[in-house]
Amino acid sequence: LGVEPEYVESDWDSLFAGLDAGRYDMVCNGVEVTEERAKTYAFTTPYGYIHTALAVRKDNTDITSFEDLKGKTTANSLASTYMELAESYGATVQGIDTLEETIQLLTAGRIDATLNADVSFYDYLNVHPDADFKLVAQTAEASHVAIPVLKSEDTAYLDALNTAIEELRADGTLKTLSEKYFGQDISSEN
């Protein structure tokens, strides 16, 4: 793209506000494409495909599916697709900033379950193999992960991002990076 990026870390629930206010040009943080988000933002070609997984403590036998969340408590990032999915199954959701905090609440027994990207849980378990939780369900359909930018009649920036993503896919870089950081290829739906 010929630009030098400036990386800005922020809480999940403020990422889109920062994009809206022009503090960021894009958000690269595992953003799932949804109909609601597509009303406001233009998305690149997906660079990843993930499934939402449901995690519970290892000793939990009451929750084995998303349907079992009715009346249970979860912790998820505010405004995330995971929060929305948990609520759609009747869970009460506690807003949390990080996966680390969520897992601490789960393993301490302060929440019943949590939802997140399957690859995020796998990554956590690779670092913490003795963590006291298990995955009991995941969505059948993969979510598309892409980069949102503000909608504009001038699509040059979005086109440049799409070209870069396709070049990274074609030369195998996306596959290599996803295998390195997630232990599997999430760069294609296959």
Q: What do these predicted ranges mean?
A:
Residues Y49-V56, Y122-A164, Q184-N190:
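Periplasmic-binding protein-like
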Residues E6-G18, T61, L78-S80, Q94-A108, ...:
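Short helix-initiation/N-cap motifs at beta->coil->alpha
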Residues T81-I96, F133-L135, A156, T163-N190:
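Ligand-binding clefts/hinges and TM-proximal coupling segments of bilobed small-molecule sensing domains
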Residues V31-T40, L85-S88, D112-E141:
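A ligand-binding cleft/hinge motif common to bilobed small-molecule-binding domains
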Residues L1-G30, D171:
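Extracytoplasmic small-molecule ligand-binding "clamshell" domains
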Residues D25-M26, D112-A113, A146:
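Short, Asp-centered acidic motifs that coordinate Mg2+ and/or phosphate
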Residues R57-T73:
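Flexible hinge/capping segments at coil-to-helix
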Residues L19-D20, L69, L106-T107, I147, ...:
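Hydrophobic residues within well-ordered alpha-helices
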